[in-house]
A protein has these predicted regions:
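Helix-turn-helix
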Residues: 1-14
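A short secondary-structure junction motif
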Residues: 2, 26, 30, 55, ...
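C-terminal regulatory/oligomerization modules of transcriptional regulators
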Residues: 62-63, 68-83, 138, 174-175
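C-terminal peripheral helix-coil segments that are non-catalytic and often amphipathic
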Residues: 100, 104-116, 125-175
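Hydrophobic alpha-helical connector segments
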Residues: 18, 34-68, 124-127
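Amphipathic alpha-helical segments enriched in hydrophobic/aromatic and basic residues
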Residues: 12, 16-23
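Amphipathic alpha-helical packing segments from all-alpha helical-bundle domains
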Residues: 72-112
């Protein structure tokens, strides 16, 4: 029941933070599993893009959590976890650490691909947010994406790959 939840969380926002953090930790775990035997940084980045841009199905081997439902919650409510007046205090309490850890993991792949790229962490966080935004648009606001005939995650993957590799392969301009 809702009353029972408040034994563990002081309010709904804290519950949302817990769920969002669980999701980002799970995504990092998935990324580690998918890339542990991959040697090339380009393939690791492509794997990260694929994991972030494709829909999540529930894994019946994990009865304690419904991954598809968790993904849907993060897609529709996740931004509310940090778009608050107390974001600095929450950050100081390390409530966004799982998201930062996932960004750092992907930033490592970016640095390995192009050690001279100046903004690996920014590109990594942008890639994550863009993957979620594009997936959300595909599901709920299809005119924002101008998809061909059907909802196609491959379009999102191609777009993200062009954006990410285009940014990393573009020569840096000096001031």
């Amino acid at each position: 029941t809702e009353a029972g939840i408040y034994r563990y969380f002081e309010n709904k926002h804290r519950l949302l933070l817990y769920l969002v953090d669980w999701y980002w930790s799970w995504q990092e775990y998935r990324l580690l599993q998918e890339t542990k035997n991959v040697t090339g940084p380009k393939t690791k980045i492509q794997t990260a893009i694929r994991l972030l841009a494709t829909k999540v199905e529930d894994d019946i081997s994990t009865g304690h959590i419904n991954e598809k439902l968790l993904h849907n919650i993060v897609m529709s409510e996740g931004a509310k976890s940090w778009l608050t007046k107390h974001v600095e205090a929450d950050n100081k309490d390390k409530l966004f650490q799982p998201f930062k850890d996932l960004c750092a993991r992907i930033a490592e792949f970016i640095k390995a691909y192009n050690p001279k790229y100046a903004f690996p962490f920014s590109l990594s966080s942008t890639m994550i947010e863009m993957a979620h935004s594009q997936h959300f648009y595909m599901q709920h606001l299809p005119s924002m994406k101008k998809l061909k005939k059907k909802k196609n995650e491959e379009d999102i993957i191609r777009f993200l790959e062009q954006m990410v590799f285009g940014a990393m392969d573009c020569p840096a301009k000096s001031k």
